[in-house]
């Protein structure tokens, strides 16, 4: 009989929803969502604790609870390799990539590629690829896994549940922006860890300890005779009934079908660089840090937290197979269909089955809230990051003169568009059931992301890499990967009791080896074409490579108080007013010619500094909130003051409420003095500065977390 929610369970779930919505509305009150950086980068005001929790929970979504536990049930420890690998790659993000992103002054990863190489070809290519991956892999898999848990554990209507969750998540993201996302992620991280640890302790106590888990897992084979008699199956064949011989090893022999160690090190690891160091969902959170110390601290915290999934998700999945062997390890497609509604296998129900059978009343509601937290955290991450990429890397190319207000509106409309696509994808997701969902995700990503990882690594570590090399190398890798992906879908793996008649290059070459080839072929083509074509300009590599860390060039000499402006890449327009020289700092993306024709009242974000004397006390047309708001890196450089005033005068209470609710206007957008603006610029300059004491502490943490990661790999692979 299917378990149902008790009154206590319902109360806990309801309390969770109330807390989440309260946090979202709190973010609406406290944050400045009416600017590009305020909405998309949380005003660069987040601490390492909040960002570290957000990094963890954004990655550990519902597909991890379903997919990781399912792969643990099907193949043992192997899937834990991705978690320990992430632990190490997070530090690569914090110590190498993030300083470059901050120094480059970018919001999105496509924007970085555009700034590093010039032009828009690579920017558009990467933006389109990211949106495809978000919508058709991350989003679809998250919805399926979350819906599977709800359906398996609670018996709720699948479509109503999914639509409700999507709607709440979209409302939270649209109203609060990244501040709301990070605040709620902090709550959800705590909730996830408590709930998952509780289930882990209960399940291990049920088995009798960790060593007993390993012993009994290797004996967890279904009773074929009993199953045939119980279900009266017409198909008496059985397959994949016994645990794999290397189930208790993580990195396995080179021909293993799950994790061959050469493929994982040479192919999967470089491919994972895209997710952890160049994926908007992850990087956008770290870019919201107050400074580089908080950014590094957040990756250290997330790295330590990545030790947990192996024990709180993978091991419970293995325990589920031990306790419910005949269901989790179904013997053939007909049996699997009767047990879980999927002919490919039933390992994906391992975690929800464990929850419903072992967790007592009350705690079951907590676990339900954990799964909702996982689903919503992933969805809000995708909604926010995808809308950022679309708004700043696609829409901005179409509407180059778009105001900051227009960008905010477009970002929110795109979230609504993604909601519609998500709901339309639900029927397709229900049919897209695989035996090991998590490995399915990795396979799709490994066909598309290795070329991107190669481009980012070459862009950062090799100054000679230019736009032509990156474009042709990236496109070659993309075409090869797309062809392999199409072939993989065209020649699907047969059911386990059927012969495999696929071509040898499909069935015998592991996807990690394909990823290896894509990564190195892309890199080779990029290097060759770059060497045969002109090198990049000095401006393109001035702040965008690893070797230009300290190279902040000052274009004009101003007074010491004005130095904070120099870290931004700006052109200087010199003009004369009443025999007094004035420097206007022109935001990126604007030429002098485009500025000269503007009237003072039409200019909103030109920052003025005088060469002699103190700055003026106030500047009537400056409304910048933070250093990032002032420049917006070319994204919101100019906004029409006249249009804003007209809208304010004509709008009634209703429109004022709508503006506040959606973050189009903010009570904090008062006129700012130039002195305040310069102080904020000083803070921006200090983002890359670290004291010696902080450096020592962070480096000790780096050594500790990397040592732990390597130890885990060795311990679980020998």
Curated annotation (Swiss-Prot):
Explain what induces or represses this protein's expression: Induced by hyperosmotic stress.
Q: Does the keyword Transmembrane helix apply?
A: yes
> What are the residue positions of the site described as Implicated in sodium coupling?
24, 285
Q: What PROSITE patterns does the entry give?
A: NA_SOLUT_SYMP_1 (PS00456), NA_SOLUT_SYMP_2 (PS00457), NA_SOLUT_SYMP_3 (PS50283)
Q: Which UniProt keywords apply?
A: Cell membrane, Glycoprotein, Ion transport, Membrane, Phosphoprotein, Sodium, Sodium transport, Symport, Transmembrane, Transmembrane helix, Transport
Give a GO molecular function annotation for the protein: myo-inositol:sodium symporter activity
Stretches that traverse the bilayer? 10-29, 39-57, 87-110, 124-144, 158-183, 187-205, 304-324, 354-376, 407-430, 444-462, 511-532, 696-716
Q: What is this protein called?
A: Sodium/myo-inositol cotransporter
Organism, per UniProt?
Homo sapiens
């Amino acid at each position: 009989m299917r378990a149902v929610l008790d009154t206590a369970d319902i109360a806990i779930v309801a309390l969770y929803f109330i807390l989440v919505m309260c946090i979202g509305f709190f973010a609406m009150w406290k944050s400045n969502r009416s600017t590009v950086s305020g909405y998309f980068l949380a005003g660069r005001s987040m601490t390492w604790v909040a960002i570290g929790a957000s990094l963890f929970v954004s990655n550990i979504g519902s597909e991890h609870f379903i997919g990781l536990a399912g792969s643990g049930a099907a193949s043992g420890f192997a899937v834990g390799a991705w978690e320990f690998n992430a632990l190490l790659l997070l530090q690569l993000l914090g110590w190498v990539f993030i300083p470059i992103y901050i120094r480059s002054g970018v919001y999105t990863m496509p924007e970085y590629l555009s700034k590093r190489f010039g032009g828009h070809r690579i920017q558009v290519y990467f933006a389109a690829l990211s949106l495809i991956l978000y919508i058709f892999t991350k989003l679809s898999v998250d919805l399926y896994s979350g819906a599977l848990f709800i359906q398996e554990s609670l018996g709720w209507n699948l479509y109503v549940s999914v639509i409700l969750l999507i709607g709440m998540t979209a409302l939270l993201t649209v109203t609060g922006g990244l501040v709301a996302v990070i605040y709620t992620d902090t709550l959800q991280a705590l909730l996830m860890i408590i709930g998952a640890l509780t289930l882990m302790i209960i399940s291990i106590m049920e088995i009798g300890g960790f060593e007993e888990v390993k012993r009994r897992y290797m004996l967890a084979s279904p009773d074929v005779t009993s199953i045939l008699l119980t279900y009266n199956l017409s198909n008496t064949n059985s397959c994949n009934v016994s645990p794999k011989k290397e189930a208790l090893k993580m990195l396995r022999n080179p021909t293993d079908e799950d994790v061959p160690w050469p493929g994982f090190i040479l192919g999967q690891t470089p491919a994972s660089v895209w997710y952890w160091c160049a994926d908007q969902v992850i990087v956008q959170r770290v870019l919201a840090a107050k400074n580089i110390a908080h950014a590094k601290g957040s990756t250290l915290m997330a790295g330590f937290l990545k030790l947990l999934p192996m024990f709180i998700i993978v091991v419970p999945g293995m325990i589920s197979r031990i306790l419910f062997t005949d269901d989790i390890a179904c013997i053939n497609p007909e049996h699997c269909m009767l047990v879980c509604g999927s002919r490919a296998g039933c390992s994906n129900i391992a975690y929800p089955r464990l929850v419903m059978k072992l967790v007592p009343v009350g705690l079951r509601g907590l676990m339900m809230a954990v799964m909702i937290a996982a689903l919503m955290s992933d969805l809000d991450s995708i909604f926010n990051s995808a809308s950022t990429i679309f708004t700043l890397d696609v829409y901005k190319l179409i509407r180059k003169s778009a105001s900051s207000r227009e960008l905010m509106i477009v970002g929110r409309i795109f979230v609504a568009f993604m909601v519609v696509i998500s709901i339309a994808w639900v029927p397709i997701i229900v049919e897209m059931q695989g035996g090991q969902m998590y490995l399915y995700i990795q396979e799709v990503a490994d066909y598309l992301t290795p070329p991107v990882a190669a481009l980012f690594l070459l862009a950062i570590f090799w100054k000679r890499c230019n736009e032509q090399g990156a474009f042709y190398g990236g496109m070659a890798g993309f075409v090869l990967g797309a062809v392999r992906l199409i072939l993989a879908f065209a020649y699907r793996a047969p059911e386990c009791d059927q012969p495999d008649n696929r071509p040898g290059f499909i069935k015998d070459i592991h996807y990690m080896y394909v990823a290896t080839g894509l990564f190195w072929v892309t890199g080779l083509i990029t290097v060759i074409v770059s060497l045969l074509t002109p090198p990049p300009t000095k401006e393109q590599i001035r702040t965008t490579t690893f070797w230009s860390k300290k190279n902040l060039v000052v274009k004009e000499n101003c007074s010491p108080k004005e130095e904070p402006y120099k870290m931004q890449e700006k052109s200087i327009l010199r003009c004369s007013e009443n025999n007094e020289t004035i420097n206007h700092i022109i935001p990126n993306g604007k030429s002098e010619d485009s500025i000269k024709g503007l009237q003072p009242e039409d200019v909103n974000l030109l920052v003025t500094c005088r060469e002699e004397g103190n700055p003026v006390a106030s500047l009537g047309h400056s409304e910048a909130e933070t250093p990032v708001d002032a420049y917006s890196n070319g994204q919101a450089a100019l906004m029409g003051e006249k249009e804003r005033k007209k809208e304010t005068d004509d709008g009634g209470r209703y429109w004022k409420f709508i503006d506040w609710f959606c973050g189009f206007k903010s009570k904090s957008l008062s006129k700012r003095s130039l002195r305040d603006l310069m102080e904020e610029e000083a803070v921006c300059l200090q983002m890359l500065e670290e004291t010696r004491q902080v450096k020592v502490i962070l480096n000790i943490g780096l050594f500790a977390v990397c040592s732990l990661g390597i130890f885990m790999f060795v311990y679980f692979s020998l």
